[in-house]
Amino acid sequence: MSYKIDRNTYAQTFGPTTGDRVRLADTELFIEVEKDLTTYGDEVKFGGGKVIRDGMGQSQVRRADGAVDTVITNALIVDWWGIIKADVGIKDGMIFEIGKAGNPDIQDNVDIVIGASTEVIAGEGHILTAGSIDTHIHFICPQQIETALASGITTMLGGGTGPATGTNATTCTPGSFHISRMLQSAEAFPMNLGFFGKGNSTNETNLIDQVEAGACGLKLHEDWGTTPSTINSCLNVADKFDVQVCIHTDTLNEAGFVEDTINAIAGRTIHTFHTEGAGGGHAPDIIKICGEKNVLPSSTNPTRPYTRNTLEEHLDMLMVCHHLDSKIPEDIAFAESRIRRETIAAEDILHDMGAFSIIASDSQAMGRVGEVITRTFQTAHKMKVQRGPLSQDSDINDNYRVKRYISKVTINPAIAHGIDKHVGSIEKGKIADLALWKPSFFAVKPELVVKGGSIVWSQMGDANASIPTPGPVHGRPMFASFGQSLIKSSFTFLSKNSIDQNIPNKLGLQKKCIAVENTRNINKSHLKLNSKLPNISVDPQTYEVFSDGELLTCEPLDEVPMAQRYFLL
């Protein structure tokens, strides 16, 4: 006999289904479930008197015969490819299937077999996203990694050697010695890591040495001299060894202007950091480079979104990060040339248009490592409030906008750096790096983080309590953060050449090392939902930004969501 229940009761029991809408945190963003892959009346749920019991939702199938290791039940998946309700099966640390879980002996259309070997994570009423990827890391202190993990980041790419003066300013791990030591250090952390070598050298041998030592990319930074000749040399090596080049261009325009940099790049693929310019780059018009097809443009989070405090905080940040002296007028002028209200305001709109494709942190070097996802969706909220629904959306949901913005911190950085085969989205066959969120805490604090198929971080109450929930509840490392589980659950990204030369074994690395690939034959059109190529111009006197002749401007926000009410301590 069938039994009908109202939508509200169903959502409270099994989570929202097709047509239901969910508000994201305290923003004005609303998502609507596009499709439900579970089966009405045949849903699986764990608990006393519930479905996942032996002979009911749990089958007799052994692990060796197809039962999964873990199932996340009734989760609301938010990814670039859709917003759907589904069960997610995990096996051997990989995403095994997305669909309907259960017992095929008594249930129809079962994609994910639950057996005695299967653990359950209750996804009902929760949002599931891929673990996010931060591709602009200054590895200044190891404590960044825990902070990033607590925010839902599961992959960090960048450069540095610790709190050295060079690392405080630039995302470079220079030379084979430092690359080797950072790769060895990566063994200690429950995070996917990869390191950029220093790309500033006209002698290509210096760059080749770093790629062969294990660098997964090269970084050009103006503080080391980003001239047309170093740009050309760096890209030559990248093309030969299939690694990505990231660039922080010449703010002072000493070696040329933005047009000269574009000419030096010569149509080759490159990832431009803080493309608006406050983080550095040709003043005042580096922002126009986002209209080039071969450029993969990203932002860093201190300018995300534009608020009444954005300009004021930047000057001091910049002086510290780039080792400038407030007693020297030229240093002050250098700093002030990078901070422009007009280009920061335009950056908001360019993100909303899909012309800027990636958001990262710039950790401890003008950016906040634990706020990448939060600031991404604060920007989305601001644009919804100021610009209204996107043309692809309706008055009742913001699905396209949300998918556009989640892409900026998941799949697009993965594509840009040649790791999208492994991470960056919830798709069959990829590493099970996942973040589970209560909708009220979406993009602020994940309820738990799964790393390589094991729980690595979770909101957790008092360890001496009789149940897990009594306060104080806060994020804490879980078992996949320790011992050999850490080694098996996290990965290190290197150049293919270094893996071919057996660098992991020579350095005694235990983590699985994965080669980056397909970084040189991509362009902006490969980036998901963020591939617009506007014709950008900047007025050299007023700094006003125009896209295809239209002025791009917006007002700063006085108050953002996902802020004080979530961080009272």
UniProtKB/Swiss-Prot annotation:
Pathway: Nitrogen metabolism; urea degradation; CO(2) and NH(3) from urea (urease route): step 1/1. It catalyses: urea + 2 H2O + H(+) = hydrogencarbonate + 2 NH4(+). It is found in: Cytoplasm. Keywords: Cytoplasm, Hydrolase, Metal-binding, Nickel. Ni(2+) 1 binds at H136, H138, K219, D362. The keyword Protein biosynthesis does not apply. It is an enzyme of class 3 (hydrolase). The modification N6-carboxylysine is found at K219. Carboxylation allows a single lysine to coordinate two nickel ions. Ni(2+) 2 binds at K219, H248, H274. GO terms for cellular component: cytoplasm. Residues 131-569 form the Urease domain. InterPro entries: Amidohydro-rel, Metal-dep_hydrolase_composite, Metal_Hydrolase, Urease_alpha_N_dom, Urease_alpha_subunit, Urease_AS, Urease_asu, Urease_asu_c. Gene3D superfamilies: Metal-dependent hydrolases, Urease, subunit C, domain 1. CDD domains: Urease_alpha (cd00375). Its cofactor is Ni cation. PROSITE patterns: UREASE_2, UREASE_3. Binds 2 nickel ions per subunit. Its EC number is 3.5.1.5. Heterotrimer of UreA (gamma), UreB (beta) and UreC (alpha) subunits. Three heterotrimers associate to form the active enzyme. This is Urease subunit alpha. It comes from Prochlorococcus marinus (strain MIT 9301).
